[in-house]
């Protein structure tokens, strides 16, 4: 019994054959082989044939080694429980419900079950592979995890965050690029390299439309004193019209202030050419407006009138101080000397009494530079009458504008209703109100431009006839061409102011 117990503990192969993994002759017929006799290989080699105890000498048994190595993987990721689905079949709805139990991983699990059952004998299989040769570590597997599936492996991986150009200059959106670059006292939402430019905002606010012309308010003083008058920005005039030399400046500069260069040289020839061109364009505009006086033409006509008035005001502010013989700065000082010269020339009945200190004195006989200075220039009287002619034609355009508004908002040929209120829209009433204020404002500015420099411009525009003293010398000329021309102009002004006042009252009664 004791020998049988010891023999059971011995290995069937000798140590030399076991280390070389050769089939030992002792294992062929272990019951016949004597443990004391050496095997044929050890006998030929002339070495002692040593047989060690089973499990005590050499490496541990295969079953124990494989069980310890496979147990963590078997508990963490059971590969045989989930079939490797194809991603294409999943998307198309054709999923195979069969589980491949005949996979290599399933065979390995069955072998582990047989070894763990403790049969005590090595089961021989037809496959030459052993469990140790079939097993490979997880990091060295040539095939991916079966859970991913073969179809999912072929799908390219596209990350959500694509590659960005980090060197590109992107806007900071009011966030400074580096907090260390910010000086002390600067808030976080204020970028250091950004500055506010008011001119950029002006380009967005300056919208030129028919109903959005920048005109003075209704309760604004139309004839405020010098330097404090309201300023407007006239709209763009018709592009088919040609402008004179002042067109290079912005149109708002014409109405901005009453200041001008006192030392600017006056040329009657240049002024006559400007007035002649302006007179021709006003005549063409009036002919076009009379051909079709439709209500929708009032906005375009008003644009043209604004441009014409600006040019006439510019020319008048350059020529009137030269005609009167004084500037804005010296107007008060020349009042007394002008009055004495007017009394001395009153008996002669000369028309030059109003211009005693002007350049008209150079035209008198005996003047040192009279004939030589005026031989190559246009007479200044022609410039004066052209000023009046252009002003009269602009009054005519004012009349056409108010007639268009009257035809649009009032009943033609019928008196204005006393109790019944008319109706209108916001756009039409706003356009009409802006047009009325534009006409009255331009009329007051023309009066101030044509008035003598020393006269006070604080009177009302409807009753302002003091500008005529620059042309008639303070005396009302009832006879003659000039007196009749002034009478006609006065009638036009009075009719225009009555019509605009009546039209404003009608618009105020309208309800939306």
UniProtKB/Swiss-Prot annotation:
Composition skew (Basic residues), residue ranges: 56-70
SMART domains to which the protein is assigned, alphabetical: GAL4
Entry GO terms, CC: nucleus
InterPro entries (alphabetical): Carb_Metab_Trans_Reg, Zn2-C6_fun-type_DNA-bd_sf, Zn2Cys6_DnaBD
UniProt keyword annotations, A-Z: DNA-binding, Metal-binding, Nucleus, Transcription, Transcription regulation, Zinc
Example GO BP: nitrogen catabolite activation of transcription from RNA polymerase II promoter
Protein localization: Nucleus
Keyword Transmembrane part of the UniProt annotation: no
Biased composition (Low complexity): 118-127, 327-342
DNA-binding region: 14-49
Coiled-coil boundaries: none
Biotechnology: Ascofuranone is a specific inhibitor of trypanosome alternative oxidase (TAO), and quickly kills African trypanosomes in vitro and cures infected mice. As an essential factor for trypanosome survival, TAO is a promising drug target due to the absence of alternative oxidases in the mammalian host.
Region (Disordered): 54-87, 118-148, 325-351
GO MF term list: DNA binding; DNA-binding transcription factor activity, RNA polymerase II-specific; zinc ion binding
Gene induction: Expression is induced on AF medium.
Major localisation: nucleus
Role this protein plays: Transcription factor that regulates the expression of the asc-1 and asc-2 gene clusters that mediate the biosynthesis of both ascochlorin and ascofuranone, a strong inhibitor of cyanide-insensitive alternative oxidases and a promising drug candidate against African trypanosomiasis. Binds the 5'-CGGYGNNTTW-3' motif within promoters of the target genes.
Protein name: Ascofuranone/ascochlorin biosynthesis clusters transcription regulator
């Amino acid at each position: 019994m004791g020998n049988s117990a010891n023999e059971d503990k011995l290995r069937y192969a000798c140590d030399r054959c076991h280390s070389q993994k050769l089939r030992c002759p002792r294992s062929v017929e272990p019951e016949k082989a004597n443990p004391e006799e050496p095997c044929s290989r050890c006998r030929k080699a002339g070495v002692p044939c040593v047989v060690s105890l089973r499990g005590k000498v050499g490496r541990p048994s295969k079953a124990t080694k494989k069980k310890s190595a496979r147990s963590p993987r078997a508990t963490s990721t059971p590969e045989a429980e989930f079939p490797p689905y194809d991603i294409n079949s999943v998307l198309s709805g054709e999923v195979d419900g069969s589980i491949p139990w005949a996979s290599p991983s399933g065979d390995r699990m069955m072998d582990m079950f047989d070894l763990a059952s403790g049969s005590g004998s090595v089961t021989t299989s037809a496959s030459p592979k052993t469990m140790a040769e079939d097993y490979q570590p997880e990091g060295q597997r040539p095939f991916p995890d079966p859970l991913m599936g073969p179809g999912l492996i072929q799908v390219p991986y596209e990350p959500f965050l694509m590659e960005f150009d980090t060197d590109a200059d992107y806007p900071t959106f009011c966030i400074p690029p580096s907090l260390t670059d910010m000086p002390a006292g600067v808030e976080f939402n204020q970028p250091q390299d950004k500055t506010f430019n008011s001119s950029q905002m002006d380009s967005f606010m300056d919208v030129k439309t028919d109903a959005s012309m920048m005109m003075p308010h209704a309760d604004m003083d139309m004839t405020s004193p010098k330097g404090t008058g309201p300023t407007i920005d006239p709209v763009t005039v018709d592009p088919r019209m040609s402008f004179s030399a002042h067109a290079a400046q912005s149109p708002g500069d014409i109405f901005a202030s009453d200041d001008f260069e006192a030392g600017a040289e006056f040329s009657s020839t240049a002024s006559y050419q400007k007035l002649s061109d302006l007179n021709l364009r006003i005549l063409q505009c009036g002919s076009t407006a009379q051909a079709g006086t439709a209500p929708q033409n009032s906005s375009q006509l008003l644009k043209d009138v604004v441009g014409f008035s600006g040019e006439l005001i510019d020319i008048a502010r350059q020529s009137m101080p030269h005609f009167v013989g004084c500037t804005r700065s010296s107007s008060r000082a020349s009042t007394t000397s002008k009055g004495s010269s007017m009394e001395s020339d009153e008996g002669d009945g000369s028309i030059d009494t109003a211009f005693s200190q002007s350049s008209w004195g150079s035209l008198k006989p005996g003047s040192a530079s009279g004939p030589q200075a005026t031989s190559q220039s246009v007479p200044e009287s022609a410039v004066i009458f052209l000023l009046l002619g252009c002003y009269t034609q602009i009054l005519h355009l004012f009349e056409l504008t108010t007639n268009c508004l009257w035809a649009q908002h009032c009943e033609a040929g019928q008196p204005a209703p006393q109790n019944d209120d008319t109706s209108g829209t916001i756009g039409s009433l706003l356009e009409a109100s802006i047009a009325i204020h534009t006409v009255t404002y331009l009329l007051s500015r023309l009066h101030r431009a044509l008035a003598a420099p020393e006269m006070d411009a604080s009177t009302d525009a409807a009753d302002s006839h003091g500008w005529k003293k620059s042309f008639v010398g303070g005396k009302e000329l009832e006879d003659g061409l000039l007196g009749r021309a002034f009478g006609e102009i006065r009638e036009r002004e009075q009719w225009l102011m009555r019509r605009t006042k009546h039209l404003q009252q009608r618009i105020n009664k309208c309800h939306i």
